[in-house]
From Swiss-Prot:
Taxonomic source organism: Aspergillus terreus
One Gene Ontology term of the molecular function aspect: lovastatin nonaketide synthase activity
Reaction catalysed by this enzyme: holo-[lovastatin nonaketide synthase] + 9 malonyl-CoA + S-adenosyl-L-methionine + 11 NADPH + 19 H(+) = dihydromonacolin L-[lovastatin nonaketide synthase] + S-adenosyl-L-homocysteine + 9 CO2 + 11 NADP(+) + 9 CoA + 6 H2O
Region named LovB-binding: 226-272
Designated name of the protein: Lovastatin nonaketide synthase, enoyl reductase component lovC
Keywords for the protein's UniProt record, in alphabetical order: NADP, Nucleotide-binding, Oxidoreductase, Transferase
Binding site for NADP(+): 51-54, 174-177, 197-200, 215, 262-263, 280, 351-352
Assembly notes: Each MAT domain from the lovB homodimer binds one lovC molecule to form the final active lovB-lovC megasynthase complex.
Listed result of changing residue 273 to G: Impairs the binding to lovB
EC number(s) recorded for this UniProt protein: 2.3.1.161
GN (gene name): lovC
Amino acid sequence: MGDQPFIPPPQQTALTVNDHDEVTVWNAAPCPMLPRDQVYVRVEAVAINPSDTKMRGQFATPWAFLGTDYAGTVVAVGSDVTHIQVGDRVYGAQNEMCPRTPDQGAFSQYTVTRGRVWAKIPKGLSFEQAAALPAGISTAGLAMKLLGLPLPSPSADQPPTHSKPVYVLVYGGSTATATVTMQMLRLSGYIPIATCSPHNFDLAKSRGAEEVFDYRAPNLAQTIRTYTKNNLRYALDCITNVESTTFCFAAIGRAGGHYVSLNPFPEHAATRKMVTTDWTLGPTIFGEGSTWPAPYGRPGSEEERQFGEDLWRIAGQLVEDGRLVHHPLRVVQGGFDHIKQGMELVRKGELSGEKLVVRLEGP
């Protein structure tokens, strides 16, 4: 299938960070070139992640585009693409604020897909629903990889079974990453147990948690040790502060185990030598590494690129089959000013158990 006769406009609207480190709507932003192995997308909906709100200072490339999660309509395909056609709907992730590709970010009118970190939107799934998935899929997959746990098999009728229950503690079980991860853990045969606020217990259980605990309950680490018969080996920390790290280390069983967080964790709270530690870095899913400041800088990796491709092949099938579902949504209709306003809501932590999605209506 050759290139389609779509000519990008000379300028587009995008959300960026200017020379003064201010988030701004740029109405004269450039449009990206179309690589031979990718597709050109008119962005219809975007989701806002906490990471989007942190792209300032040393993390910002002035005038590069913001945004990770997008869903949209294919308007052109590269000459090497054979499985997608104009008019198809796709969703995926971008490596925002990447200095090598400053004109590729989700918060823009047009974007091009990146690597194989994207998939077709199944029938019955809206743009808004699809836009809520990419960062969660990518981070959940990276977390499972770092914990040493296998990804689900999309062809298996039933999850694999273990001779004994294998529990995985998910601290912050009502976050968007947690709800995707718990579903994937279930599909891989593991048993998630979660902590969150009581008003989100039903959400965590609906996304795979076997049991949910109030994170403020007294002596909770001991309660979880008792619940898991002191055999908990895996903990995923979706909050990552001194309290969450300390708690996870206390809940892991006497034989030790593995702790993974979504951000660099406070090392002074990692108090047990029998517990291995790591943390996820979103851009590694593309295999491109990261140019962010220490400790986030990372070289590119072919192994990580291949993992990202495998993950998205699996996750895309699970979404298509209805076995992997999105986080509850708070949808806003509007333009790029609404994305900017939504970023402030997310930055201030004003959402609980919801993913903020903006359905684009225009600049």
